[in-house]
């Protein structure tokens, strides 16, 4: 990774703080149910592995999407920062340790960090990674620091999601924001059943101002259960 040791340490501390915030049971409960994740399209902006190796942020695809180090300078993502904990479970409620989890989304201006987006450099948030990956620990949990998803033409706010594990192979889906007004007009959301919507709808809770200031400007937190057929 291109981050200097002090910056890497800072990113680790911020991620740990975000994870602690969403893990606190009196702050926010885990959302989700026994309905398995419905497969959904990955869309045209999934960062293929070859592009990740050669792209502008090569080697910097960690679980903190809100900080990018380039040319010796750390940039911070615009938008409302979100601490997101995902718990990977099978339909019996068993944790799937070792599950690989990838997320990707547009920046706060609705642009993807992807060559197919066609955005000019000036139109893309240079402080937002756009893609992150992590591997679940013994409790099947992964923690990301990202931004509250933003809408763009034709789509409600969402986060793309890809999971891999020997027990189920690979599944691609999307996460939505519970109660988001734009959901009703989204063509993919409208195709989902009520149970599937519940399985994909993140419940975002505001972070108290003092806590958010300590956690590097964290604004929202969510803990969400991802149920898979395994």
Regions found by a protein language model. Give the residues of each.
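N-terminal secretory signal peptides and thylakoid transit peptides that target proteins
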Residues: 1-21
């Amino acid at each position: 990774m291109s981050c200097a040791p002090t910056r890497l340490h800072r990113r680790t501390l911020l991620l740990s703080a975000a994870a602690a915030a969403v893990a606190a049971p009196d702050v926010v409960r885990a959302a989700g149910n026994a309905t398995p994740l419905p497969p959904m399209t990955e869309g045209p902006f999934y960062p293929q592995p070859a592009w990740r190796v050669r792209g502008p942020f090569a080697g910097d695809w960690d679980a903190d999407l809100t900080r990018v180090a380039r040319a010796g300078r750390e940039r911070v993502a615009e938008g409302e920062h979100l601490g997101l904990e995902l718990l990977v479970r099978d339909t019996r409620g068993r944790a799937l340790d070792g599950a690989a989890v990838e997320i990707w989304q547009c920046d706060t201006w609705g642009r993807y960090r992807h060559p197919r987006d066609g955005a000019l450099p000036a139109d893309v948030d240079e402080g937002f990674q756009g893609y992150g990956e992590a591997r679940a620990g013994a409790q099947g949990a992964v923690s990301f620091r990202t931004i509250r998803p933003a809408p763009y033409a034709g789509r409600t706010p969402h986060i793309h999601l890809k999971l891999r594990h020997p027990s189920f192979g690979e599944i691609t889906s999307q996460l939505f924001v519970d109660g988001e007004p734009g959901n009703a007009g989204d063509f993919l959301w409208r195709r989902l059943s009520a149970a599937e919507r519940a399985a994909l709808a993140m419940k975002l809770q505001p972070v108290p101002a003092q806590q958010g200031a300590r956690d590097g400007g964290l604004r929202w937190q969510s803990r969400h259960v991802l149920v898979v057929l395994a």
